[in-house]
Amino acid sequence: MKKVIITPSKLRGSVKIPPSKSMAHRAIICASLSKGESVISNIDFSEDIIATMEGMKSLGANIKVEKDKLIINGENILKDSNYKVIDCNESGSTLRFLVPISLIKDNKVNFIGRGNLGKRPLKTYYEIFEEQEIKYSYEEENLDLNIEGSLKGGEFKVKGNISSQFISGLLFTLPLLKDDSKIIITTELESKGYIDLTLDMIEKFGVTIKNNNYREFLIKGNQSYKPMNYKVEGDYSQAAFYFSAGALGSEINCLDLDLSSYQGDKECIEILEGMGARLIKNQEESLSIIHGDLNGTIIDASQCPDIIPVLTVVAALSKGETSIINGERLRIKECDRLNAICTELNKLGADIKELKDGLIINGVKELIGGEVYSHKDHRIAMSLAIASTRCKEEVIIREPDCVKKSYPGFWEDFKSLSGILREE
């Protein structure tokens, strides 16, 4: 599919929110590190999740697919030291989580990928490799990382403002090493919510880590993961698209959301309420955001970078000025998301100025429409689809298939909510 052509209309109806990609990554990893059989249910087989499944299989996990379930047995994880190739596709989570895991025992591994993945920072791990004399080589731009050796317990100093994925990768790994370890966070920690997800999942699988106010993490060695059955909860980062559409006037009931979730992207509710939208709890695990008199605000992107593109859509149609701050990390995602969402929404008639680490958005009453480009980024494509609900004319989105990275059923769900689109 080269493009979708959307006729502007309000979305109406109920939608089952897809399972959390963040939680699924973590559950698959913990189950694969457990000695015994786990069943992980409510899986959405997006490209990123498939990359993590295949990566853990390469490391020795036995993973069987039964409909939306995974039967995982980690008895043979890292049992052999044969050369391994792990294809991360475009998944930053797969790459950064599995690099340290692959070094639990002496190993020789080649990580490959595509798209923008090779441009995303890995210096945190390179510094650890050098300190521990782990051999490594890599190619600039394209992801082709070769590593050889094993990780040892001890003290790890990690910056908290690059990516929380490095910290999560170490949190998965260090409990399985012989010696005790300590992770010291040397800067302000961004995306704390993702660390909470990791700690919660690790604890569910029987591993204990002491969190000293996110400044350091104390990890006893020689622990083991215990198999369990786990159902993946609904994804707030995907619900954010429908919440935003609701704030802009659509009427959508979002199903399968855990109100007690640790997901950091749940913050989208608080942000939208702060702008003037209203939250309606329809029934258990069912939420709607209702349109209100929307006003500009200040949005700190440091703790919830993934929902910034669609919140920019809402801000573009709110009264007054909205500032997106602390968003420099959005430049090193699947694309430069600050530039992409600014460029494409301005094509539709928005008034957005791009800054080094954020955006200044002056709200307009309506968007016009036109042809835009997804930048092959799933969150940009879905954000532009939500923007179309408030356009006067058709919106043409080029390269829409990129949604398969995280939400393969997005366009079908969009149509099920009375979205009017045709594919070419």
Curated annotation (Swiss-Prot):
One of its GO terms (molecular function) is 3-phosphoshikimate 1-carboxyvinyltransferase activity. It is found in: Cytoplasm. Signal peptide: none annotated. Its main location: cytoplasm. The keyword S-adenosyl-L-methionine does not apply. Gene3D superfamilies: Enolpyruvate transferase domain. It holds the Pfam family EPSP_synthase. Keywords: Amino-acid biosynthesis, Aromatic amino acid biosynthesis, Cytoplasm, Transferase. Its EC number is 2.5.1.19. It catalyses: 3-phosphoshikimate + phosphoenolpyruvate = 5-O-(1-carboxyvinyl)-3-phosphoshikimate + phosphate. Disulfide bonds: none annotated. CDD domains: EPSP_synthase. Catalyzes the transfer of the enolpyruvyl moiety of phosphoenolpyruvate (PEP) to the 5-hydroxyl of shikimate-3-phosphate (S3P) to produce enolpyruvyl shikimate-3-phosphate and inorganic phosphate. This is 3-phosphoshikimate 1-carboxyvinyltransferase. It comes from Clostridium perfringens (strain SM101 / Type A). The lineage of its organism: Bacteria, Bacillati, Bacillota, Clostridia, Eubacteriales.
